[in-house]
């Protein structure tokens, strides 16, 4: 609600290529993440966290969750993500981070290049730093893009050009040319 018009427009691009979003049974259990996003070209789990502090350190159960997501990502060739909400922020309060997974292919690999990894503490433990994450509206705009979406957009643009510009010109030419009208009558 408090996002700018630009942020809202970028986020709404996802409506062109939506996902089926499933709340994982036993959310918070190891390896599943809280949400599973599914679409024909890509699938990924998301672990959701929120805090009033910009930095959220993982420890105990949350480190085990991270390690389980890492293991599932490796075994299943999936790219898990964290969605981190900073409470009390106006505008886009969500930031996206990825769990580091090696050997991804296809769209998962492209997506992994765009999203920052969870930073590490001095002792190597991952944590969430809101300032270092990718804003949710940018993440949504990126995953909404695809070749088929671009093709749909270009086909729609071509139809619009034809219907708004070319078709009226053709109709105008057909109706204003006496030779055209006479030849079309003699052909019938």
Regions found by a protein language model. Name each.
Residues 1-26:
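Acidic-basic catalytic patches of nuclease active cores, encompassing PD-(D/E)XK
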Residues 25, 48-49, 83-86:
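Short His-Asn-centered micro-motif
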Residues 26-27, 36-38, 74:
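Short, conserved, surface-exposed binding loops centered on an aromatic residue
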Residues 31:
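Beta-rich catalytic cores
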Residues 35-37, 41-52:
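Conserved catalytic cores of phosphodiester-cleaving nucleases, focusing on short active-site segments
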Residues 51-75:
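Mg2+/Mn2+-dependent nuclease catalytic core
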Residues 70-104:
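Nucleic-acid nuclease catalytic cores
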Residues 92-185:
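Intrinsically disordered, low-complexity terminal regions enriched in charged/polar residues
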């Amino acid at each position: 609600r408090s996002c700018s018009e630009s942020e809202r427009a970028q986020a709404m691009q996802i409506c062109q290529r939506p996902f089926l979003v499933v709340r994982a049974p036993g959310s918070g259990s190891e390896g599943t993440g809280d949400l599973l996003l599914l679409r024909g070209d890509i699938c990924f789990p998301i672990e959701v966290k929120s805090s009033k502090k910009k930095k959220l350190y993982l420890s105990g159960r949350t480190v085990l969750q991270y390690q389980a997501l890492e293991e599932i990502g490796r075994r299943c060739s999936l790219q898990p993500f964290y969605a981190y909400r900073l409470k009390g922020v106006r505008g886009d309060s969500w930031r996206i981070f990825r769990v580091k997974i090696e050997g991804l292919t296809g769209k998962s690999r492209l997506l992994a290049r765009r999203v920052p990894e969870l930073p590490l503490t001095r002792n190597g433990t991952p944590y969430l730093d809101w300032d270092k994450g990718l804003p949710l509206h940018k993440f949504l705009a990126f995953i909404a893009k695809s070749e088929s979406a671009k093709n749909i957009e270009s086909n729609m643009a071509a139809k619009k050009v034809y219907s708004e510009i070319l078709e009226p010109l053709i109709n105008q030419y057909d109706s204003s040319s006496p030779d055209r009208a006479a030849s079309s009558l003699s052909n019938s």
